[in-house]
Amino acid sequence: MPTRVCCCCSALRPRYKRLVDNIFPEDPKDGLVKADMEKLTFYAVSAPEKLDRIGAYLAERLSRDVVRHRSGYVLIAMEALDQLLMACHSQSIKPFVESFLHMVAKLLESGEPKLQVLGTNSFVKFANIEEDTPSYHRRYDFFVSRFSAMCHSCHSDPEIRTEIRIAGIRGIQGVVRKTVNDELRATIWEPQHMDKIVPSLLFNMQKIEEVDSRLGPPSSPSAADKEENPAVLAESCFRELLGRATFGNMNNAVRPVFAHLDHHKLWDPNEFAVHCFKIIMYSIQAQYSHHVIQEILGHLDARRKDSPRVRAGIIQVLLEAVAIAAKGSIGPTVLEVFNTLLKHLRLSVELEANDSQKGSVGSVTVSSKDNDEKIVQNAVIQTIGFFGSNLPDYQRSEIMMFIMGKVPVFGTSTHTLDISQLGDLGTRRIQIMLLRSLLMVTSGYKAKTIVTALPGSFLDPLLSPSLMEDYELRQLVLEVMHNLMDRHDNRAKLRGIRIIPDVADLKIKREKICRQDTSFMKKNGQQLYRHIYLGCKEEDNVQKNYELLYTSLALITIELANEEVVIDLIRLAIALQDSAIINEDNLSMFHRCGIMALVAAYLNFVSQMIAVPAFCQHVSKVIETRTMEAPYFLPEHIFRDKCMLPKSLEKHDKNLYFLTNKIAESLGGSGYSVERLTVPYVPQVTDEDRLSRRKSIVDTVSIQVDILSNSVPSDDVVSNTEEITFEALKKAIDTNGMEEQEKEKRRLVIEKFQKAPFEEIAAQCESKANLLHDRLAQILELTIRPPPSPSGTLTVTSGHTQYQSVPVYEMKFPDLCVY
């Protein structure tokens, strides 16, 4: 009887419930009843309006089975749901989807790993279904939170933990695919969701044992690796997420990366950080690259007070990002990037200078901090170099001017970098760092004319005396000049100072000097000669300085030299030889021999370049004589570790020196204008010499004049019986000495105007005129305006003359006039 009652009751139940009940076997181990499942599917397709009821009833049964821990029936219910979901594609499926998502949520909330994985797999299948019309009211907040939590699973069993994490990553991937394609439903890009999704993916990517350090875009992993390795699957999902990011939501996807790296202290060491940003730069669209760079710069500003290693790690990440971004779109904020980098460079130098001034207390710690700051500085310079070298020429010239404007130059206020707290040591350090940055930016820069590469606004501060106070500064200045002068890649052939037997073997590339280059040398040639001349006479020069000076002379000869410039360069070389022999600057014997070797190497080079046989013969003869009698005058010997130096140079034979008269005779026979060779080269005096802290060349010239004047014998014979008193000595010094000095000055001026080239005289007159103009302007600024007059002041308004009187009670009288 009870059985009949049940049969009667079941017959009264709705058909969809009977069909649903029939798919469940008595023993869950038998699995889904396929025949009844086909009937249920056919019924759902035939009557789509019943889908919501079928889904609700399945959800009811599944919830009951989950509570009662009937895992077998749960598996059957989810399998049936999946089949119905895949078979039905209509508008009526939307209510069914709500029931489906409710059942998936029930499985994810359960504490059993198998059910969580089962729910995730069903959600992934659902995510791959393309709906005809998306449902905008549907939200996935719960699934984002739950899948993110599964990505951080800490299950005691490693296999189960890995399985749960893989399920969480696949779930996040499903959410992304389901929502990210719909532009009208952008909730997934909101910060509260990205703050969960991105760290969850990075947490699993962090488990990669060996971080990929390839420069190119990494190859896509295989399907087997994705299914078995959480790190590989997380990286694939991260790439997919970034690849779908647009202009408006790019920052929301990148900022959680910084938070994760900060929280887990992954900037030092920064291998994982570099790996992450390589993935970001290669995954996003090229036109959005500059957004990522701006975010890195902003984070660098925010962490400016952190340890040097953390800042260095961020800058190295920026370097990798810039190296990738520079190949595509860089964006309009190039100067902002360089400005931020230079600001952090100054900050690093300032911190280094402050640490070095703390004294010997904690010297080990201070030394360690200094080394860390050097890491920061090198990272900044490399980043500037990579960024600058990939810019187009028009932008690179702007960056060159921008960096040069930051270089502190003594006596001028043109630089825009705050160095008030750096001190002398810090200022020198920032000069070196900026010049190193400039060197990297100018590397590979090719300008059609030298005027474009070295404009006056760039050349003047570059050749400033302030950048000659240290041998390293001078090296960097010369290297920057070489980058800009060497337009035919000849510098590598000239590397190393040596006597070249046959210059033709070097296969020097050169072109005919254009009119713009000739004009440049007429205007700035004396400035270049002066820099080389003074650079050779510095006491702290090392071998590299002489090599770079030799290369400078050779490059000027190749790129900029016509007949007049060749004569000027030979004059300069002879003047250097004379300065080494006379030794007015009290240089050491090594430096004097180094100058002699430099002159020999250059005259050997220029004689073969202009191919005048008599000149080549004279140079070769002097070099042969030096090889036999004075090898320390040749670069191959003087720059060796152990070289015997002479005690003096005054007693040497004239055959060891290059003689002006023989050079003039040889060049004159070939049509060169050699009148200027007989005029000794004297570097022009500039205004910067008067402002510089270094010993001015004016002082050197005045000392020479004093020595000469004192050595000239007096024509007047003083009587032995003359009374010698203090007043007499004072009078003799005031009259006789001054007269001799005036005579000598007049003689030098007359000789200069008779023999010196017009360009040199014009340059000196121009510098004096500029100095006079500046002094006059200062005097006019200090001039006090006269007091107002009661009669008024004359003003012109709209073409009419008017007087504006000043009331007496408003006038200010001197105190002595008031009683």
Swiss-Prot record:
Component of a complex required to localize phosphatidylinositol 4-kinase (PI4K) to the plasma membrane. The complex acts as a regulator of phosphatidylinositol 4-phosphate (PtdIns(4)P) synthesis. In the complex, EFR3A probably acts as the membrane-anchoring component. Also involved in responsiveness to G-protein-coupled receptors; it is however unclear whether this role is direct or indirect. GO terms for molecular function: protein homodimerization activity. InterPro entries: ARM-type_fold, EFR3-like_ARM, EFR3_Homologs. GO terms for cellular component: cornified envelope; cytosol; glutamatergic synapse; plasma membrane; presynapse. It is a lipid-anchor. Widely expressed. Expressed in neurons of the superior olivary complex of the auditory brainstem. Also expressed at lower levels in the cochlear nucleus, the lateral leminiscal nuclei and the inferior collicus. Induction: Expression is reduced in animals with impaired hearing. It is found in: Cell membrane; Cytoplasm, Cytosol. The keyword Nucleotide-binding does not apply. Palmitoylated at its N-terminus, anchoring the protein to the plasma membrane. It comes from the Eukaryota. The modification Phosphoserine is found at S360, S363, S420, S692. Belongs to the EFR3 family. Keywords: Cell membrane, Cytoplasm, Lipoprotein, Membrane, Palmitate, Phosphoprotein. One of its GO terms (biological process) is synaptic vesicle priming. Component of a phosphatidylinositol 4-kinase (PI4K) complex, composed of PI4KA, EFR3 (EFR3A or EFR3B), TTC7 (TTC7A or TTC7B) and HYCC (HYCC1 or HYCC2). Pfam families: EFR3_ARM. This is Protein EFR3 homolog A. The keyword Lipoprotein applies. The lineage of its organism: Eukaryota, Metazoa, Chordata, Craniata, Vertebrata. Disulfide bonds: none annotated. Its main location: membrane.
